[in-house]
Amino acid sequence: MEPRIWLIAGPTASGKSALALRLAEASGAEIVNADSMQLYAGLRVLTAGPGPEETARAPHHLFGSVDPADGWSVGRWLRAASEVIADIRGRGRPVVVVGGTGLYFRALTQGLAEIPEVPADVRAKAAADFERMGEAAFRTRLAEVDPAAAARIAPGDRQRLCRAWEVFAATGQALSDLQRTGAPAIADWSAVALEPPRPALYARCDARLHAMVREGALEEVRALIARNLDPALPAMKAVGVREFAAHLRGETSLEAAVEAAQQETRRYAKRQITWMRGQMAGWPRLTADDHEGQWRQFLAQEPGLTP
């Protein structure tokens, strides 16, 4: 019998990392990251990645392993994750894939088409169009050919908006359609999605920001902005980078920066929940508002596991 694969999805601060670690310890599994921001090195505190204590309790993969200057696509993550999962299972161990990036889970379970390389002149024209038209008009134009991408991509995400348009311009096909085709990378998987009550989730988001400041998030942002990277890179869009960078430049107080980051974290969690409800409607839900309750709910669905 092939080693098990468990998928654990959930919004930020929902408790999914704690559940994944407990499951890994109970089953002997290794943990694979499916969070697009926890990929990047130097942002462990800001992205709530695993620390030395967690990594000592179970092997973790694809956390903090990518330079922020190297922006990864969904396809690149899928190739890396598929290799890691195959290696873990080849050694006879189960796998827990955990994160909050819905596109990663969709690519893993439904497949991802090989998207042709976009010519440099098409990329340049998309970027120029964005600057000329502005985000609102550019998004409206994108919605005419790829409404799913236009609705899904977060405000201010120039890179993904341009990417969606340039793929259509180069291929004549919507990026959203291409992302739905291809062979699944894994089979015979089990999944849960965490969706604690909204008030408890938001309170946890707020508390987490204060803890991040105490644990060194400002120092991480200071080191990141000192590199003068392209602001369109994915790592530069991590929640807290823009807000804390404004404080470090003397443009706002620390209190105001924390409040702004808390608000953006809640918005991000809401977008993740919306994605889960639309794209993971068939995944069993864990709705408890604490780690113990979530673990009990999980065990009820996995009677073969022992606490």
Swiss-Prot record:
PANTHER family tied to this protein: TRNA DIMETHYLALLYLTRANSFERASE
Single biological process term from Gene Ontology: tRNA modification
Gene name of the encoded protein: miaA
Molecular function via GO: ATP binding; tRNA dimethylallyltransferase activity
Listed InterPro entries: Dimethylallyltransferase, IPT, P-loop_NTPase
Positions marked as site (Interaction with substrate tRNA): T101, R123
Superkingdom of the source species: Bacteria
Pfam families cross-referenced by the UniProt entry: IPPT
EC number: 2.5.1.75
Native source species: Phenylobacterium zucineum (strain HLK1)
Keyword Transferase applies: yes
Chain positions recorded as substrate binding sites: T12, A13, S14, G15, K16, S17
Described function: Catalyzes the transfer of a dimethylallyl group onto the adenine at position 37 in tRNAs that read codons beginning with uridine, leading to the formation of N6-(dimethylallyl)adenosine (i(6)A).
UniProt protein name: tRNA dimethylallyltransferase
Chain sites annotated for binding ATP: G10, P11, T12, A13, S14, G15, K16, S17
Keywords, sorted A to Z: ATP-binding, Magnesium, Nucleotide-binding, Transferase, tRNA processing
Assembly and oligomerization: Monomer.
Upper classification of the organism: Bacteria, Pseudomonadati, Pseudomonadota, Alphaproteobacteria, Caulobacterales
EC supergroup of this enzyme: transferase
UniProt family annotation: Belongs to the IPP transferase family.
